[in-house]
Amino acid sequence: MDLLVNKYQPSEIQDIVGNEATMELVSLMIESRDMPHLLFTGPPGTGKTTCAKILARRLLGNKEGLLELNASDERGIDTVRTTIKSFAQRRVKDCEFKIIILDEADSMTTTAQQAMRRVMEIHSSECRFILICNVFTKIFEPIQSRCAILRFDRIEQSVILKRLKEISEGEGIRITAEALDLVVELSDGDMRQSLNILQACINSPGTVDQDYIIKIIGLPSPKRIEKVLQRLLKREVEEALEMFDEIWEEKFDPLDLINSFFRAAKNMESYELLKVIGLANLRISEGVNSRLQFYGMFWDILDMGSKRL
């Protein structure tokens, strides 16, 4: 059985969901049969690599003129000096220009990027680069200046939801509307992640609900998280800490845990809670993820409540 991410991988530019303005620019390149050096940047699961491969295939129609590399595996200067440079110098019959797709280019060493800039300068007439990265600020500035930068934003939730409905119906996956909404929320604009979660639902013996999603993903129960917040807002501190400590001992990832608190606050429609939890989320996402960070957040919630009294 094919994985959903493979089965539903777009084969044409118009099949890629989201980022319509960027897709229009890429379509114009296909129509003109030409392209500059390109830098695709944006979060995971937004179609960068798929778009690059479709663009290369439509322009070349010839695999001999295409080199695909993942820079996280081949990130050093030797790759530039041997693989990339030799490919750029090679002649390919009936090929106006060659294309090098370099995925995860932001993982390349500075020395490797400096060497690659030189290759881009010398061979720009017969070889074009498509660099793909999550964080474009990690790309050497002289390389950025030689590329047209196309930004891929997180895919809108409504777009992901529509696509998941189509796929779940086509695959015969019985899933509640609430569960689909949760899948969309958990994927955070990442189409690939949403398909991976849906993949885990295929063998469900019954209708997939929110509890099933939470179980397979390994997240804390939203009801338990909401109860912790409710206890804090009622200033029942001892009970709230006891409930939280039980959740903490289950060894959830701190980032998953703080995101669960954030979702609970959204459901409770409390702007003040969202603000406090959002600040804690920022600290934890930067790697400061001890239990004390959560205790500090709880203190801020209590302080927030006392100011309202």
UniProtKB/Swiss-Prot annotation:
One of its GO terms (molecular function) is DNA binding. GO terms for biological process: DNA repair; DNA strand elongation involved in DNA replication. Component of ATP-dependent clamp loader (RFC and RFC-like) complexes for DNA clamps. During a clamp loading circle, the RFC:clamp complex binds to DNA and the recognition of the double-stranded/single-stranded junction stimulates ATP hydrolysis by RFC. The complex presumably provides bipartite ATP sites in which one subunit supplies a catalytic site for hydrolysis of ATP bound to the neighboring subunit. Dissociation of RFC from the clamp leaves the clamp encircling DNA. This is Replication factor C subunit 4. The keyword Transmembrane does not apply. Keywords: ATP-binding, Cell cycle, DNA replication, DNA-binding, Nucleotide-binding, Nucleus. ATP binds at V5, V17, G42, P43, P44, G45, T46, G47, K48, T49, T50, N134, R192. InterPro entries: AAA+_ATPase, ATPase_AAA_core, DNA_pol3_clamp-load_cplx_C, DNA_Rep/Repair_Clamp_Loader, P-loop_NTPase, Rep_factorC_C, RFC_lid. The gene is RFC4. Present with 2760 molecules/cell in log phase SD medium. NCBIfam families: PRK00440.1. Belongs to the activator 1 small subunits family. One of its GO terms (cellular component) is nucleus. It is found in: Nucleus. Component of the replication factor C (RFC) complex. The keyword Chloroplast does not apply.
